[in-house]
Each structure stands twice: as structure tokens, then as C-alpha cells.
Amino acid sequence: MDIELFLADLEGRFAEQRRRDNDLLVEELTDAERAGVTLAARLLAVDGPVTLVLRGGRRLDGAVRDCTRTWVLVRGDGGDSLVPLGAVVGAWPLGRVAAGETGVKRGAGMGHVLREFAARGVPLVVDHDAGAHRGRIVAVYADHVDVEAGEGPVGDSRDWGAGARVSLALSGLRELRVADGRW
């Protein structure tokens, strides 16, 4: 037995095992890192146009203007849209890079935003699982809002008279737009 060949073979096997162990470690670390990355962080890192698919299948194309842990603000051809992150069921292109979770601000929650819309009497178009409604939010509760129909037909509020109210569950919100297109 040639001891030099024996040692070279042994070192080669150890080196190969180290490479395999390192590859496995890199895979495990990558998986662990990805497990902590939220959709909000990836949306915040998008530089350029993005397409969101909302619950129900509607596509929204535009640029991410702002994003918190609960909502994303997208500017598209039709103006700005405030979308609860829970309503986003698909998005592209997101790329591989994500903003650090520390970059995703806690920001005002959806309830706070809705209360501010109500306080200011902002005319909105509310896209909801129960249909599209044009009007003003007049009350915000723990899990739903009351919307008072405004002027002009939009979606499912077309048959309402001005001033009629509907209560909409927050879990069904898909998108909010200012009725005249300007925030």
C-alpha cells in the first residue's frame, strides 16, 4: 500500500464531504432566510412596474409607492390604489432581492387609514368581495365598515340611492381608490 496515495485519497474524500456539507448548509441558510421574508418586503424592493393579482382575479398594474405590513399603495394608469396585503394572491416580477424586514415600516394599519378616510369624508371606490361600491366610509368597526352610497354608479352600488348604507367586512376588502383619482 502506498501511503501517499492513501492519504491523498483520504484528503480528497474529506474535501468532497466538506463541499457537500457546505452546499447543504448554504441551502439550509437560504431556506431559513426565505422563510422570514414577507410579501411586503419583496414588494417594497421592486424597482419598476409590478403586476398584482387580487382575490377574485382582478389584475392591478403599476408601481409600488409605499408598503407596510398590512397594505401596499400602487400607482397605476387609473390613479393610486390602496390594497390590503391579504387581498394580494399573486405578484410579479418580484425578483430575488427583498428589502430587509426592518425596511418594512409598521405604518398606519388598515383600520387607521379607513378611520382617516371616514373623518375626512373622502369619496372612495371600494372594491370588495361583495362588489364595487362608490361612496364614503361613515363608520369603521372592529371587523367591518359602513359605506354610504355617493353620486355616480360604480359596480354594485349602481342601484342604490345616494345616502343608502351597506356594511362591508374588512376581510372582503380588495382595493380602495379615491373616486376622483387623487389622494
Model regions and ranges:
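Short glycine-rich, low-complexity segments
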Residues: 1-183
